[in-house]
Each structure stands twice: as C-alpha cells, then as structure tokens.
Amino acid sequence: MLKHRMTFILVAIAVIFPFIGYLLSFYTDWLFFAETGFSSVFMTTVYAQTGAGLIFGLLLFAFLQLNLHYANKGSFPLSGIYIVGGGDIRINRNEAGRLVRPVGILISLVLAFLAGNWGAMRWEDLLLFANRVTVGMADPVLGKDVGFYLFSLPFVELLKSFAGFMVLAASVLSAAAYYVKGGITLDDRGAGVDPRVRRHLAVLVGLFGLVVAAGFYLESFSLLLSNNGAFHGAGYVDVHGRLMTLRILTFLTPVAGVVLALGIWRGDWRLALGPPVVIVALYLVGVRVYPGLLQKFKVAPNELTLETPYLENHLKFTRYGYDLDKIETVPFDVDTKLSAADIANNDATIKNIRLWDHAPLLKTYSQLQQIRTYYKFFDVDNDRYMVNGQYSQVMLSPRELSYADLPSKNWINERLIFTHGNGITFGPVSRISKEGLPEFFVKDIPAVSLADIKVTRPEIYYGELSNEYVVVKTKVPEFSYPTATGNINTTYAGKGGVPIDSLLKKALFAAQFKTEKILLSSDITPESRIIYNRNIKERVRTIAPFLSFDVDPYMVVDDGGKLKWIVDAYTFSGRLPYSRPVQGGMNYLRNSVKVVVDAYDGTVSFYVSDAQDVMVKVYSRIFPGLFQPISAMPADLRKHVRYPNQYLQVQAAMFAAYHMTDPKVFYNKENLWQVPTLGEKPMEPYYTIMKLPGEKVEEYILLLPFTPSKRDNLAAWLTARCDGENYGKIRAYTFPRDRLIYGPKQIDARINQDSFISQQLTLWSQRGSEVIRGSLLVIPIEKSLLYVQPLFLAADKAGLPELKRVIVAFGDEVVMEENLELALQRLFGARKSIGTAAAAAAPPGAPAAAGQPASSLAKEAMSIYQRALNLQRQGDWSGYGEELRKLEQVLKRMAQ
C-alpha cells in the first residue's frame, strides 16, 4: 500500500511540477504586461492560445473517443489473440478487452494534449484569419485577393493538417481496439476483418479521402508560391500542366474515396484497391511526368515567349513585396567639373562626411570614456541633431553597465547596488583633435556638455547589455557614478518595474528567478520594485512577438535631456504570391512600426510609420490598444526617426535585379546590378547629410552605391530620405551606361597603387603601428563624386586608434592629407568656408589659394624645396616624400 502511495505521489509531482513553472512564468508575464500598460495584448494572446488549444484538443479527444466507443461496443466470436510465429502463445481477448477503454482514454488524452499544444502555438494564424482584411490586389492566375494568401490560407492549411491527423489517429486506434477485441484477426492463414469493422473503417477512409481532396485544392494555391527555377510563382508549366491536374484530382479524389470506402464496406478488396492506384497514377503523371515533358519539349525552346506573362507577374509582386515601387529612378549625368566654389556651396555636406568608422571609434570611446572597467560601450550609432544652431551628423554611444566586468560579484552588488549604466558619449562624425582623437559634444561622468545638448537623466536601466533583473528602492543605496572623492549614490525615482509589496510576490519572484535571496533579504521593502525584461530587444519582443526587430536599436536624447531608445520593427510574411523570398522564406516585408523605449523607466510605445501596410492593419485590429499613429510620437523624437540600414540592405539586394521592369531585360539579366565589395565584404549603407540633386537644403539620408554585376564601375546610387515629410522616399540615381564612372573597388585599387600612399603605409607598418583603413565612402556633390577614406593608426592591436590621415579621390587624382580640409585644398584650392581652423591646421607648404601671385607661389615652392633637402639630410624619408608631394601641388598651381 505504501509503495503504491509513493508511486502515486511521484507521478503527481512529475505531472504537476511543469505546470508550477508554467504558472510562475504566466504570473510574472502578467505583471510585466500590466507594468508596461499592455495587459490587453497579453490577454488577447492568452485567450487565443487557450481557445485554440482547447478547440483542437477537445475536438481530437471527442473524435477519438467517439470512434473508440463504437469500436468497444459488443463482442466478437474469437476467444483469444493468436500470436503469429508464437506457437501456442495466446492472449485472452476478454481480459485484454477490459483495457481498451482506459488505455484508449489515456492515449486520447495524450494526443489531445499534444494537439492542443500544437494548436496553441498557431494562435497567430487563428487571429490573422479572424481579423483578415482585403488588400485590393488579386493574384493573376486564380483571382484570389492577396489577403487570402496572407491571412486565410495559413489557417485553412492548419485545419487540413489537423483533420488529416485526426482521421489517421482515429483509424489507427480503432484498428488496434478491434484487433484486441477480435474484430481483426491475424493468423498463419492470413487476416480476417469483421463486417462491422469494415463498415467503421470504410467511413474513416471516406473522410480521409475528403482531406486528401482538400490537400489537392490547397496545393493549387501553393503553385503561386513555388520556385520553378527561372523565377518564383506559377509559370507556364504550372498553369497549363499541374493546375489542371490538381483541379481534376480535387473533384476526383472524393469520388475515389467513396468507391474505396464502398469496397472496404463490402469486403471487395479489388474494388477497394482500384481508386488509390488511379489517384496516385494520375498525380504522378499529371503533376510530375507531364509537366516535365511540357517543360522540355515546349517551354524550354520558347521560354521567354511563353513565360513573359508570368515573369511580369513575378516582377510586379516582388516589387510590391519589398515596396520597391516607391523607388523613384532619376538619371545622374555625372561630370568632373567640381570646383572650389561648389565645395563652398556644399559646406554642410563636407562638414558631415563621416570620418570616424564605427569599429575604431568604439575602441577609442572605450579607452577614453569608459571611466571604469564595469562600464562598456556596446555600439556606436549615427544620428543628426541641431548642435549650436548647425544641422550636424553625430555619433552616439551609451555607457552601459557590464555585469561580467564587476570587480566584486555577489547578489547584493549585481542586483541591488550596480543597477544601471550612466550617460552617453556624443560627438561629431568628422572633427578631430590635433592628436587624431575624436571631439566631443557630451562626455564624462557626470555628463559634461560642450554644446547645447543637455543630458538631464543619464541613468540607463534598460539597454542592450541589461540582461539581468535588479531590485530598486531598497535599503541599499544604488551606485550612480564614481568621483575623485568617492562614489555618488542614487535612489530610483521612476515608475519602471513591478512592486514587491507582499510576501506572496517575494516568494513567487524568488521561485521564478531561482534565488531565495529575494524572499529572505531584509533590504527589500514594500516600496521596492523588481525590474526585469530590461534588455530592450527582449522587452519589445516579449510584448509583440509577431513583429521582427532590427538588429541595431539606437539611442536619442530628447529635448528634455532624457535618453530614449528607438527600435525599428518589421511586419513580414512568406505567403505573397509570385514574390521572390529572401533567406528564411520571407517574401513580404515592411518597416511599418517604430518602437520607443525609455532608458530610465522602461516605458514602451509602438508607433505605426507606414499606415498602408496591410499586415499592420490586421495587427491593429487584433491588438487595438497596442499601436499609435506616428503623429502621436513626440516631435522631439520624430525628428530622430531614420530609415533603417537593415531594411535598405534587403531592398537594395532586391532592387539590384528588380529595377529591371521589362521581362525581356530581366530574363536576359541585361542590366543586373550588385552591391560593391571591398575585400570580402559587401559595402553597407551609410548615413550622411547632403543636398540631393534638385533639392535646396541638406538633409539626412541613407546611401548605398551599386555597380554592374561582375564589374567594378558605378551603375547607380540609392538613397533613402529620413527627414520630415520626405521620410521613406527613395531615389535611385543612375549613371550613363556608356561612360566609365569609377566604383569603390577601382578607387581602392588606385589608392593601393599610389606610390606615395603605399610608401607611407609601409613605413607606418614597419614602425610597428597597425594601419586601419576606414570605410571608403562615395559622396555625391553637385554632379560629381568624391571618394573619402580615413586612415587610423594604432600602436598595436590593443592600442588607441587615432585618425591620422584622410584620403580623398576625385576624377583621376588621389591625395592624402592630415585632415579632410587639407585634402580638399590640395584638390580644389583654398576655400573661404574652411576658415581659420583649416588655415591654422595647414602646415607650411599647403597649396595656395586660387589667384595667389606667381611670385608668392615661387617663394612657397622654394621654401618647400629647402625643407625637403633638410629632411633628406636627416634621413627622414617619410617627411621628405611628404614635402615633395606638396611641392608637386604648388608647381601644378603655378602651371595653371
């Protein structure tokens, strides 16, 4: 008795224990959603999961029990189960028959639980179907609205799969029950099936025939999502071969199912075997063999002619899938007539050329501004601000807390004292000190502002490195920042986190986070709050798991000096007909949501930036309290919204081929583009501030060049606009195809071939310095192109990268100078807009201004020559080469 009781207790614990974990997770999730103000989102999801799970689970259980109940009724004449090959071994059927009902219930419960869990995981398909909308664009083959494919087809396929599993499971369990009861016999003479058993199984077979017919019907829609080799979507062979066969099979299969069921009912196995053979043969011939012959003998010799209408469908729907129709194509008639006056007229563009690369700058920030080992700069982001009245591109990096680098690791330090990061490092993209280091607008702890950007709330409780829970408002003061005289402490004053105001909550959170310290700590008071889901990516994904989120969240400073994160979110689908998928199967993508997360109190807001997106329309109907219009976003945050780099990369990868809208040109790949590669990596889009051709003012844009496929000259440059009413507008500026326009790889080769530059790089390397070549940027100015590449030097791989040189290429000239202003002076002559700073930075021998007297130039040349001789005598060959380079430029000026 005791043994049975212990067994029961152990089984009960094994069954209940997983549910305890589930209930704990459910409760903490509920508290999290209540804290963030999205309880309705949580409950909608819970209702959908619970409803779907119950419906699928109960349906399967009821159907299985109905069939098992019928199978278990009555008895059969045979008294025992004969084991084939087992000699005299027999099992008493009456004894075994008593187990049919309890075992059947147990198996039904297990299968129902699995089916319910499977259905609960497909809750999103259920909600999309229930809240579906029409798109207003029909597929060109079957005439169904695109909304059917996006919202209805996944759910209908789900029902078909469930129905098939339900009938198969009932058939197997019923057959097993009949075997145990004696309705099905197996012995050395063969198999025997009772007439009542045949009738039961015949009904199930007929039902399965309906499921197979539904599968053929749905497969016709799948043709529009297939890959036929030349393109994605239904082609000539699919429409004129497979589609007709699938339609025939859709109507023929139920008839075949009835005949098959009739044969089983009567026990006529010849009649029963005929229909499956016919269906399988028709499928193989009509869906496999005939289309292959049609492709080989009719389509292949006339592919372009026959496939043109379907290619047009493919082009249209792929362009719609990635929103490529909004890209405006503009001819860009490039020339090499850029002058000093043009440079002066585009001063804002020049000043905002990004010289600081992310990787070297992150390393430099870490060494100059990390302050303590437990702080860490995880990433550097680009943005734009009005700084001292000037529209400026900046680079910003949050100073987050790295728990892995805490000097003393214990629960109190990690959970109560060190709770947050502190402040940002913030500076211009192009300005450098005399030592080759970045300049700052905001730096240090506490924040020191060297411009009119103020940070009033520097604490970062929510970030990219905040992966652990913390408890705030405890008896233990929180560490804020270090000073020369000691540490400054703080107490959290925000509304983030969940109050731990009861013993029950303490116990539940202690169990959830697997530590008794939350329950036992005397430092935790009724006013204390536990903050979890602090990682901003995890935080927004928990609230909206149906969205995809950008890999690069970025921080902004609002007008009140508070730190906010902006995360780009995407809606997506893999169900758009005729659209080419990217890796992962997605063939519809929109950046239709911007998410703002407060770095101090964790407040999350979702804003719809693309109201035309059909997916976000449906999600807005499913979760009516989740999204706000973009107009509701505070104006000081809206001016920092930017076009996502990741999104433009996907669009550019598609636009490289799908800018060709003529099916013949697309088929022959006559004008295929590619993103240029430098080394082994393709170029990435980069942000800059510039005046677009035909526009009157500078604006913040995202830019990416293209080259023709397998060639290195430029074909076009793609730009996505980020500011105000122009946000989201994309232009492709195309170059003349009959002229050679140097591409990044060709400019890179010319830089490598320049004797002076290569000599300098070699000398630096020989002295033990690590030479880091920054990103090569293409900068359109007026009707010309500048190429700019920064050079960084570090004493070794662990050294501090310093920006020591800037290479600028224009036309056939390549120059390298200490900064961008000097390089532009050498190329175009002095500019008034460069002003005193450039003049002060210029060493003796810098090129003279336009219009300088010849006598003055001659004296300048002689001075340079004398310095070169002195350096030669001293053995300073690097300096000697530099002076000769300057002498060459002065002589060119004299020759003009």
UniProtKB/Swiss-Prot annotation:
Membrane topology: Multi-pass membrane protein
Keyword Membrane: yes
Domain of life: Bacteria
Transmembrane segments: 6-26, 46-66, 99-119, 158-180, 201-221, 245-265, 271-291
Protein family membership: Belongs to the UPF0182 family.
GO cellular component, one term: plasma membrane
Pfam family, one: UPF0182
UniProt keyword annotations, A-Z: Cell membrane, Membrane, Transmembrane, Transmembrane helix
Places the protein is found: Cell membrane
InterPro entries in the record: UPF0182
Lineage, highest ranks first: Bacteria, Pseudomonadati, Thermodesulfobacteriota, Desulfuromonadia, Geobacterales
Protein name: UPF0182 protein GM21_2279
